[in-house]
């Protein structure tokens, strides 16, 4: 199943790094983080004041994060409604924003055909 990570703060970065470390990077379809630009996300993922430097195989090219041989779309939207979700694939959203904690706030994910949401 494809994975979308919404929020690349402390938890989102750790989820991203762990998926890559476990060789599951090809399952990551997209990341969304409203803070910074799309190209900033490579820097934020690579350098962490607590967890150190990571991601020798990570780079930002052509509007995407590339890890090893896999391209990951990057968005910088502030609301769920503005994120361009896939139309045909089943996907899991890992919401690491810390904001969307109630069923009502998670509804937009399911309206956009998310199969599962993990908060």
Where is each model-derived feature located?
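N-terminal Rossmann-like NAD(P) cofactor-binding subdomain of oxidoreductases
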Residues: 1-119
């Amino acid at each position: 199943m494809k994975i979308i990570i919404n929020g690349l703060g402390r938890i989102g970065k750790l989820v991203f790094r762990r998926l890559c470390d476990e060789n599951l990077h090809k399952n990551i379809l997209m990341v969304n983080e409203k803070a910074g630009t799309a190209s900033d996300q490579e820097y934020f993922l690579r350098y962490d004041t607590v967890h150190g430097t990571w991601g020798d195989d990570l780079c930002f090219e052509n509007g995407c994060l590339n890890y090893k041989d896999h391209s990951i779309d990057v968005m910088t939207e502030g609301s769920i409604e503005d994120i361009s979700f896939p139309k045909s694939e089943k996907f899991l959203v890992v919401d690491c924003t810390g904001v969307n904690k109630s069923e009502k706030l998670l509804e937009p994910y399911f309206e956009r055909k998310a199969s599962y949401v993990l908060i």
